[in-house]
Amino acid sequence: MEESDTTKYVIHAHISAEGVVERPDVVGAVFGQTEGLLGADLDLRELQKTGRIGRIEVNITSKYGKSNGNILIPSSLDKVETSILAAALETIDRVGPCISKITVTKIEDVRSSKRKQIIDRAKHILTDMFDNSVPESQEITDAVKAAVRVEEVTFIDNLPAGPNVLDSDAILVVEGRADVLNLLKYGIKNAIAVEGTNVPQLVAELSKKKTVTVFTDGDRGGELILKELLQVADVDYVARAPDGKGVEELTQKEVVKSLRSKVPVEQVIEVPQGRRRNKLAAQAAEKQAQAEAAQKAEAPAAAAPVQPQREYQQKEYPQRESRERSEQPRGEVPRRKSLRRTEEQQERPERPERSERAERREYRERREYREPREPREQREQAPARKEREPSEFDEMMKELSGTLSARLLDANKNVINTVAVRDLANTLKESNGDVKSVVFDGVITQRMLDIAAEKNLETLVGVKMGSVVKQPAGVKVITTE
């Protein structure tokens, strides 16, 4: 059967005739008896001329004076028009001189057959062609990536670095060349390696001009490098790999997570050696003052209950002696008197118990009456532990507690902006002078005080004071501790 390229459906019909008929007779009956039946738009001759239907295929055989066969008509019409043509075939009742009957058996969707063929072929292509080529392509891709990474590594004063270290406004300081290569693999091109704990002078000079983030390994070596960098370089942020892992071992997801979790250098516990000595000395002096104040406060409290306790013991002992003396017989007495005496001895202990309870109650009342005076004496002897006066920023500090955020206020205490603590220093440096007060959930450091004085801030409110060597006179500092 010949079909056009646009064939959508094939009409299958069965024909039976009471006599001997041949193929030309059937084709002539199909065209002749349907002509003018469905109108000009569905005329079979016109549809065949325009290619809307294909060549009519007839297979018929004759036996014992009767003929039977099949008719196939390919169609590129839609479902509705194809169904109308199929129904029109069943109206044919004569083929030549013989009575005949045509019955439509099915309408085949050619596109479904093509879909099945496409699926089978796609399975074959997928299993036989792609399996052998994927490993080879992967090897080629890995080789190209490795070559590009090696070519991108540059050396600045013999230090491995990415190609954008000198041009970028911010740099990452890592430990070794493997760390730089791993970061280049994920598109980070502004990393430079220090190659050990001896920090080169180049890194110290770059830290003065650029925003520096130290990205250390999650081991002891990373801590040592961080301490060294804090002493000789101007570090802005600190990022750390997960515990037990090096930067060269991290996946892209771990690298991004570690860099997003970076913290300002002010939040890092370790500080340069000179500041550390001052901080330790201040902490030792504070602890000594607190210990002396606590001893002075505890001295009156410890001495107060001693005297009532001795009085209570002195009062208790004569009662016990009197009871013991009353229980000792002075001589022989009649039996009735001894019985009375034993009854009295059984009844007498109740009175001393009541007197003891009364004395204990009186002693507790005296202690409760005297204890409220102790905090006053303690405040008089240790004025350093006086409670902090309430501030107009207390409510705002409660709102910021635990958020690691900061609020910038104008002269009227209105909130201008809210930023993260790690971005506070850069935000203040870029401010235009309208910020007069800063309230943040963090530690007040020397660097923060210097920036506040430079920007003419009036008030700086934080959680506590850090290692501050010099406090500007024009900046009022308030802490919640």
UniProtKB/Swiss-Prot annotation:
Residues 169-243 form the Toprim domain. Mg(2+) 1 binds at E175, D217. SUPFAM superfamilies: DNA primase core. It comes from the Archaea. One of its GO terms (cellular component) is cytoplasm. It catalyses: ssDNA + n NTP = ssDNA/pppN(pN)n-1 hybrid + (n-1) diphosphate. GO terms for biological process: DNA replication, synthesis of primer. InterPro entries: DnaG_primase, Primase_DnaG_arc, TOPRIM_DnaG/twinkle, TOPRIM_dom. NCBIfam families: PRK04031.1-1. This is DNA primase DnaG. It comes from Methanocella arvoryzae (strain DSM 22066 / NBRC 105507 / MRE50).
